[in-house]
């Protein structure tokens, strides 16, 4: 008969970011362990709060499934003597395996027969197995910053304070961290007193809820959002759903109750970011805005408790926020006493990265590279002036009071101060936009100046890090180089900006000169960064639904122009839907295999002996004239359609002409013809990478 199993690990409050990954690990480890141990179950769920991790297994079998296995023994011919009697070899084997001669079977491996012992290992009681595996399931959880406590060797998110383990109504006995498992748990730290004796897993869920603990993070999150929306509506406003903030609040409490507070309307004169950042980032409050999106002097907080004394709690939150906003207002006013441009010289004292100079050096490099980009993209004089001014001021807000106190406001405060200093709106916007995108799914720059500065800034960081040997490895990417590379890719793709990746790397590399010692030469850096971007592009193309072989085909054909890669990939994906595509690929792959032997693409008409090759050459010459302009216009869909028209004459060519003939001149000419044909398609994709499914 199956029983439910419950494991609860009671701990001191852990950081919010630890909870989700811990519950995922706990479930995955349990699934893997039970599978290896042959213990069946109906369902596994994990729950948790900052004070507890809970594992619940529904209908866990009372015993392991029996294990039947075969153990290879000696060859049959070595197991019996001439009279058919067992030899010492087989007797020793049966004795070592604990089986009799009747438990042996014959199995053939190639031409040789071997004796195998049939063994059956009966399953052990699940209760015994659970007692053995529970310590490992808990100790096997990994946290970003585990800690030790007391004299223990165990490392965990926070000190473990109790262990509850029940299989049905029985305690599963084990010891960990000098604690013995039992049937006792504890409710909310302040709303529940004393321990709770749990009869069985079902009893746990009833009693823990009665002790003001909602153990299901999904339920807490839903309840919090519902309360927040109701309070915002009651105040005539709305709250923008911030998933990160919502998740963080969900994971720092056990019994959520939302409340609405207010602050002085005078603070609404400050820029919105100056108010929202302290609320969200420091106090974990939800700002309330009007239906038109205008910030109101309201905020919504969530307490870990009931509505008892809610007025006092609200007043306390208002007092704390009032102090935060007063500080922010002071910093803002102090920053305005000097123009943003006056901060630029101070950047010489701010280190960019050890070995790569100061932020002032980086600003100079960004300006130089931005000028290359502006010229390449055909920016007019006014645009180039705005780009250079934006480059000069891009990092100036790093040494303002506001950004020192709230680093996440870099760029936003630079834009605000630039506007108040009378800088051109295009310059101010570029200061903000050069940080975009900051994370997956973030905004992209909308202005030319913002895009140029963003690409220059990010490429400078990527090239500098690669040049001194700092590269992302595995899950480690301390300088967010992957994110910055993805940002460049998305900007170029979405903005339809056509630039050479190789030139970008060269320009950035050349910006590092006096006082900077680079460990790798330019060619090394180009090679490594090209591969780095290639991997990012693979992910982008896969996310757009392109098959792996379509991705390989377009990337093999080249990816120096990043925006161009996506255009070619989407055109090829659509081209693959044509009914005749498979037949075309068959012909092209045959041509490609032969073209590998070619040493030239120069076709000598005098050696075109057969009408089929003459017809193919004539059509190819005509197609080159039609396709080249389409490629220049990046009209890859039409270019591929034109290329497809060569299938029929190509099929005729292969049916009528022998390529690898003895006449060297004729053979060379035919190979050149095929190489020329394959080269035309290589402007879009390498068709040899396409996998054609045969039916």
UniProtKB/Swiss-Prot annotation:
One GO location term (cellular component): cytosol
Keyword line: Aminoacyl-tRNA synthetase, ATP-binding, Cytoplasm, Ligase, Nucleotide-binding, Protein biosynthesis
Enzyme Commission number: 6.1.1.14
Biological process (GO), any one: glycyl-tRNA aminoacylation
Principal place of residence: cytoplasm
GO molecular function: arginine-tRNA ligase activity; ATP binding; glycine-tRNA ligase activity
PANTHER family in alphabetical order: GLYCINE--TRNA LIGASE, CHLOROPLASTIC_MITOCHONDRIAL 2, GLYCYL-TRNA SYNTHETASE
Similarity comment: family membership: Belongs to the class-II aminoacyl-tRNA synthetase family.
Entry protein name: Glycine--tRNA ligase beta subunit
Organism encoding this protein: Desulforamulus reducens (strain ATCC BAA-1160 / DSM 100696 / MI-1)
Lineage: Bacteria, Bacillati, Bacillota, Clostridia, Eubacteriales
């Amino acid at each position: 008969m199956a029983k439910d199993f419950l494991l609860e690990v009671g701990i001191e409050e852990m950081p919010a970011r630890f909870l989700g990954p811990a519950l995922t690990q706990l479930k995955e480890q349990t699934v893997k362990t039970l599978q290896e141990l042959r213990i069946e179950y109906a369902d596994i769920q994990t729950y948790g709060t900052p004070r507890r991790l809970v594992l619940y297994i529904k209908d866990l079998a009372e015993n392991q499934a029996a294990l039947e296995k075969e153990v290879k023994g000696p060859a049959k011919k070595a197991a019996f003597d001439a009279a058919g009697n067992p030899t010492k070899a087989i007797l020793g084997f049966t004795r070592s395996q604990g089986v009799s001669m009747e438990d042996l079977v014959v199995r053939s491996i190639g031409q040789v027969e071997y004796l195998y012992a049939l063994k059956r290992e009966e399953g052990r009681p699940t209760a015994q197995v659970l007692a053995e595996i529970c310590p490992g399931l808990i100790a096997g959880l990994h946290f970003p910053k585990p800690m030790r406590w007391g004299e223990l060797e165990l490392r965990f998110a926070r000190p473990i304070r109790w262990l509850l383990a029940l299989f049905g109504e029985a305690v599963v006995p084990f010891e960990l961290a000098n604690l013995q498992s039992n049937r006792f748990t504890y409710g909310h730290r302040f709303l529940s007193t004393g321990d709770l004796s749990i009869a069985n897993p079902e009893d746990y869920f009833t009693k823990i809820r009665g002790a003001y603990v909602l153990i299901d993070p999904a339920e807490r999150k839903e309840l919090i959002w519902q309360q927040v929306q109701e309070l915002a509506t009651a105040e005539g406003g709305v709250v923008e759903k911030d998933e990160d903030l919502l998740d963080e609040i969900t994971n720092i409490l056990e019994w959520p109750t939302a409340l609405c507070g207010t602050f002085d309307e005078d603070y609404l004169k400050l820029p919105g970011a100056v108010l929202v950042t302290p609320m969200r980032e420091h106090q974990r409050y939800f700002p309330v805005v009007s239906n038109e999106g205008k910030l109101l002097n309201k905020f919504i907080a969530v307490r870990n408790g009931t509505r008892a004394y809610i007025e006092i709690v609200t007043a306390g939150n208002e007092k704390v926020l009032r102090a935060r906003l007063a500080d922010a207002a002071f910093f803002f006013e102090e920053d305005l006493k000097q123009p943003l441009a006056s901060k630029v010289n101070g950047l010489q004292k701010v280190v960019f990265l050890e070995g790569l100079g100061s932020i002032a050096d980086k600003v100079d490099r960004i300006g130089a590279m931005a000028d290359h980009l502006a010229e390449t993209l055909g920016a007019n004089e006014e645009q180039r002036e705005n780009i250079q001014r934006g480059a000069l001021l891009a990092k100036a807000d790093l040494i303002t009071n506001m950004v020192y106190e709230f680093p996440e406001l870099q760029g936003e405060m630079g834009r605000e101060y630039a506007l108040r200093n009378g800088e051109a709106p295009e310059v101010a916007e570029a200061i903000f936009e050069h940080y975009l995108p900051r994370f997956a799914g973030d905004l992209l720059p909308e202005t030319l100046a913002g895009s140029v500065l963003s690409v220059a800034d990010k490429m400078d960081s990527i090239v500098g890090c690669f040049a001194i040997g700092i590269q992302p490895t595995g899950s480690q990417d301390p300088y967010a180089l992957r994110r910055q590379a993805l940002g460049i890719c998305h900007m170029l793709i979405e903005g339809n900006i056509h630039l050479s990746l190789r030139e970008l790397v060269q320009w950035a590399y050349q910006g590092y000169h006096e006082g900077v010692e680079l460990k790798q030469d330019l060619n090394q850096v180009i090679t490594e960064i090209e591969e780095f971007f290639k991997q990012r592009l693979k992910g982008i193309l896969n996310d757009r639904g392109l098959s792996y072989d379509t991705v390989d085909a377009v990337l093999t054909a080249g990816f120096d122009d990043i925006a161009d890669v996506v255009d070619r990939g989407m055109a090829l994906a659509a081209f693959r839907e044509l009914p005749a595509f498979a037949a075309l690929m068959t012909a092209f792959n045959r041509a490609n295999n032969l073209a590998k032997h070619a040493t030239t693409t120069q076709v000598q008409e005098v050696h075109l002996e057969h009408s089929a090759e003459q017809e193919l050459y004539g059509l190819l010459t005509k197609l080159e004239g039609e396709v080249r302009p389409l490629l220049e216009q990046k009209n890859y869909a039409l270019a591929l359609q034109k290329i497809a028209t060569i299938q029929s004459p190509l099929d005729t060519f292969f049916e009528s002409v022998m390529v690898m003939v003895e006449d060297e001149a004729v053979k060379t000419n035919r190979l050149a013809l095929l190489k020329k044909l394959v080269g035309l398609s290589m402007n879009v994709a390498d068709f040899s990478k396409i996998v054609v499914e045969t039916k």
